[in-house]
């Protein structure tokens, strides 16, 4: 695995758990999407946008279900499905209800938006010590739904649960596009 794809060194990780995480995250996804879209345009002439998985849509009874394209072991022609080959929590087809809290984006527009424990303001909380993916810190929005979905999908041994491998699972991109 190319180390650039799995770089969660302190330099890379410093973008997590900080007030600037949301703006860094948007730039990261924007760049990834632009690279893929340019290649799709070159090969097919079609426009392309990164899809997202809106598991927080309370109006959709199937919102928590992992999209079928990411569950089927094979494609319609019988070939192995590259979207489902990555290790995930055994038997997961849907996020359990109650584990991913609903979140109001409108609330984030308020000047006194509080998302953390003990009144911490912001997406990822304050400055922290050494990086520990999915650890306990004060930024509740980054922790839930972001980290909760990583843990639920990845389980103990799945790629989504391992920050060094999470980006290799195609569900990572749907999840992160939704977070964005």
Stretches with model-predicted labels:
Residues 1-180:
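C-terminal accessory segments of proteins
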């Amino acid at each position: 695995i190319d180390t650039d794809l799995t770089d969660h060194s302190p330099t890379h990780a410093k973008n997590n758990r900080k007030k600037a995480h949301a703006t860094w995250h948007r730039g990261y996804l924007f760049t990834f999407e632009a690279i893929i879209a340019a290649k799709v345009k070159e090969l097919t002439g079609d426009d392309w946008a990164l899809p997202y998985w809106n598991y927080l849509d309370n109006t959709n009874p199937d919102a928590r279900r992992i999209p079928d394209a990411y569950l089927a072991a094979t494609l319609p022609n019988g070939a192995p499905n590259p979207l489902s080959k990555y290790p995930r929590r055994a038997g997961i087809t849907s996020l359990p209800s109650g584990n991913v809290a609903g979140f109001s984006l409108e609330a984030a527009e308020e000047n006194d938006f509080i998302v953390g424990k003990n009144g911490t303001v912001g997406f990822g909380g304050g400055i922290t010590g050494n990086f520990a993916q999915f650890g306990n810190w004060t930024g509740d929005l980054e922790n839930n739904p972001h980290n909760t979905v990583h843990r639920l999908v990845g389980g103990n041994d799945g790629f989504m649960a391992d920050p060094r491998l999470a980006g290799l699972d195609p569900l990572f991109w749907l999840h992160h596009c939704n977070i964005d």
